[in-house]
């Protein structure tokens, strides 16, 4: 009965909200917003001088004659009709409006562009075709977000050549660490049935600068390399190519092996291999030929195939070490098969063999840093931002700055595996900025930030890129939680330019997603910006380490983790990773080693990662660690309570469907956060 009444109440609230909009509220809706349009939520702009200026420019358009003209035209028509309520006229040459043309500035590269404006026209120039695609989306964003269009003088060149989204999608549609429904690709229907959603997905990625997509899970089902699946992959590649996006695959390293000869650990798909060999030894000539033939087959179907992303000798996945070979042997074998076609290998460094070191945080560095300079020129090491496993807070991976002769691509996690799934509103951009991109490694002295390293400013690199593990699924609004889209958007903007300001990225997402006025924008910004810090305080205080259950990475799991992965007693808490402990601090350059090694100098954000600290220790706040720890556990509840109030305060500024869905998400977050707090309180009370 209570359940029925609650459902009725929600439906009634939705109905009344809709009616209030139809009969005189501040915003009139012609369509129902579901969130499907993401940040390309083109709605009529309010009447203003800025709108009239945009109408003057947007009335006539000259296309450049690029291979992307068709999608550029479609996007401009869609955007300008909706935003300005005008239908642009496309002409061969014009002295007014928007004029696109090729220029001779080779410095713009394959994807750069220049946007300039005078009184009568806006010029968009590029050296190569893709520059017009990205420049078009930038121009639309300027109009959509209400930027002045007069006196524009913008020059954009992506800082990173490879801007990648990793989809951990299985062939059965499941998404590992996915919380927005099944995976996007309907494998069973491909290649015959092409869903419109695939094109909309490509539009979304191109609009934020993404140019590479890994289609399948790194815990790879070997069947992805079968000819039938390669034809499905080719069908997706044909769609994505229109938006300057290359496809990549994650192969199973043991794919050449006969299914009947594989280890038990790999038999969840009926055996690891799909081949005819008795070995996957990378130095075996037959294995090398198998991969060469397979790569040739792939390129016969997908001429612009990007390459392979490989998870090897990690969490049960096969790899070269199964045959007493090195990561170098495995990566280079695949790289040589791909090189004639221009493909690359992204070899993941997420390994934590306990035989390497007792401290898990030291293992990746110890396994890969000695291999610097031994990988072939088309090999990249794809490396998580931190040393543990996408924790709410952890120090930056010390491999960044320690491998001068091997390209490293950061792997960030957009999906919220340890940060509240699709339940919690947690904005990840501040985390990526503070704990990773702005971290100064001191590998070349002061100013050697991770951002400067990955963009080639600190020292040169053969390839520059960044990968993000996607949070996208078949949920109607793509990410389940409407605010999770902000993390997808922010990743794309960061991958284009890691120095882009947090304020600019955040404001643009709010404006283009919620179509709101400045006052509403400020309320939404107030909701978003503190969420990461509050989540850390409540769920992973002072970078303590894993605090959630191994089974779900969501519910409180202090009993599972305590005194196994971090230490706690009535006297103290935290793990000693100083020179007197596990000596993890020595993987950092001297400046950071000394800071992390000192209890008084160590940033409090990382205090319990590096030190076992007495509960009585005096914090910067003046409180004891015990007092501040206990107080901070409430921060999650306090934040969601504030956000519920803020969200309710702008109800009449938000469309009713998305308003109600976000409100219900906040209520769910409130319930789960209270449960987590109570579990934490119950556990730690025995030590206070």
Please name every model-derived segment.
Residues 24-122, 127, 149-153:
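Acidic, contiguous N-terminal accessory segments
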Residues 447-688:
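Catalytic domains of carbohydrate-active enzymes that cleave complex glycans
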Residues 25, 219-226, 314-316, 352-354:
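Conserved short loop/turn motifs at secondary-structure junctions
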Residues 63-75, 79, 105-290, 294-307, ...:
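Feature activates predominantly on carbohydrate-active enzymes
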Residues 50-67, 182-186, 216-219, 611-629, ...:
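Acidic/histidine-rich, surface-exposed loop or edge segments in extracytoplasmic proteins
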Residues 1-28:
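Bacterial Sec-dependent N-terminal signal peptides
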Residues 90-93, 347-353, 522:
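Acidic carboxylate-rich catalytic motifs and surrounding loops in phosphoryl-/glycosyl-chemistry enzymes
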Residues 189, 261, 275-507, 513:
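Catalytic-core regions of glycoside hydrolase
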């Amino acid at each position: 009965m209570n359940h029925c009444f609650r459902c009725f109440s929600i439906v009634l609230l939705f109905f009344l909200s809709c009616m209030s909009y139809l009969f005189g509220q501040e915003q009139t809706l012609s369509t129902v917003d579901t969130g499907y349009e993401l940040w390309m939520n083109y709605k009529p702009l309010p009447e203003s001088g800025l709108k009239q200026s945009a109408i003057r420019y947007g009335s006539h358009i000259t296309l450049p004659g690029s291979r992307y003209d068709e999608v550029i035209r479609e996007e401009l028509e869609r955007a300008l009709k909706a935003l300005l309520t005008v239908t642009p006229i496309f002409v061969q040459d014009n002295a007014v409006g928007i004029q696109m043309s090729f220029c001779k500035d080779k410095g713009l590269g394959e994807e750069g562009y220049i946007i300039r404006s005078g009184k009568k026209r806006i010029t968009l120039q590029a050296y190569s075709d893709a520059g017009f695609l990205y420049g078009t989306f930038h121009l639309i964003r300027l109009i959509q977000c209400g930027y002045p269009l007069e006196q524009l003088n913008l020059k954009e060149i992506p800082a990173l050549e490879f801007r990648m989204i990793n989809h951990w999608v299985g062939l059965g549609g499941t998404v590992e660490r996915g919380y927005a429904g099944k995976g996007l690709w309907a494998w069973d229907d491909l290649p015959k049935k092409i869903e419109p959603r695939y094109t909309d997905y490509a539009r979304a990625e191109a609009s934020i600068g993404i140019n590479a997509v890994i289609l399948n899970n790194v815990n790879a089902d070997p069947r992805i390399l079968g000819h039938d699946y390669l034809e499905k992959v080719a069908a997706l590649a044909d769609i994505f190519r229109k938006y300057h996006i290359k496809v990549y695959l994650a192969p199973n390293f043991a794919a050449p092996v006969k299914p009947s000869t594989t280890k038990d650990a790999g038999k969840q798909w009926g055996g690891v291999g799909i081949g005819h060999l008795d070995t996957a030894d990378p130095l075996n000539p037959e294995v090398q030929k198998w991969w060469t033939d397979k790569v040739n087959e792939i390129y016969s179907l997908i001429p612009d195939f990007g390459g392979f992303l490989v998870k090897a000798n990690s969490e049960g996945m096969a790899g070269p070490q199964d045959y007493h070979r090195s990561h170098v042997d495995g990566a280079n074998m695949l790289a040589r098969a791909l090189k004639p076609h221009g493909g690359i290998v992204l070899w993941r460094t997420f390994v934590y063999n306990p035989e390497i070191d007792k401290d898990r945080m030291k293992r990746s560095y110890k396994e890969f840093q000695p291999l610097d300079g031994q990988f072939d020129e088309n090999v990249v090491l794809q490396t998580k931002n931190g040393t543990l496993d996408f924790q709410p807070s952890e120090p930056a991976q010390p491999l960044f700055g320690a491998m001068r002769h091997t390209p490293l691509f950061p792997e960030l996690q957009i999906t919220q595996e340890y940060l509240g799934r699709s339940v919690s509103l947690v904005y990840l951009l501040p985390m990526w900025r503070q704990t990773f991109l702005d971290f100064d490694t001191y590998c070349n002295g002061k100013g050697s930030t991770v951002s400067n390293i990955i963009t080639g400013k600190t020292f040169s690199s053969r390839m520059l890129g960044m990968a993000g593990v996607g949070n996208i699924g078949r949920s109607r609004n793509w990410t389940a939680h409407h605010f999770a889209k902000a993390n997808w958007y922010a990743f794309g903007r960061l991958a284009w330019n890691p120095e882009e300001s947090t304020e600019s990225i955040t404001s643009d997402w709010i404006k283009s997603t919620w179509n709101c006025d400045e006052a509403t924008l400020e309320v939404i910004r107030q909701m978003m910006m503190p969420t990461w810090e509050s989540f850390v305080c409540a769920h992973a205080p002072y970078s303590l380490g894993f605090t959630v259950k191994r089974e779900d990475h969501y519910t409180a799991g202090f009993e599972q983790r305590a005194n196994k992965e971090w230490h706690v007693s009535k006297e103290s808490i935290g793990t000693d990773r100083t020179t007197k402990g596990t000596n993890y601090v020595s993987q950092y350059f001297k400046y950071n080693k000394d800071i992390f090694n000192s209890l008084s100098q160590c940033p409090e954000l990382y205090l319990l990662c590096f030190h076992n600290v007495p509960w009585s220790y005096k914090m910067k706040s003046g409180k004891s660690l015990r007092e501040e720890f206990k107080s901070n556990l409430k921060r999650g509840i306090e934040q969601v309570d504030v956000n519920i109030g803020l969200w309710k305060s702008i109800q009449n500024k938000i469309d009713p469907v998305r308003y109600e869905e976000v409100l219900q998400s906040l209520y769910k977050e409130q319930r789960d956060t209270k449960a987590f707090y109570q579990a934490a309180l119950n556990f730690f009370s025995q030590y206070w």
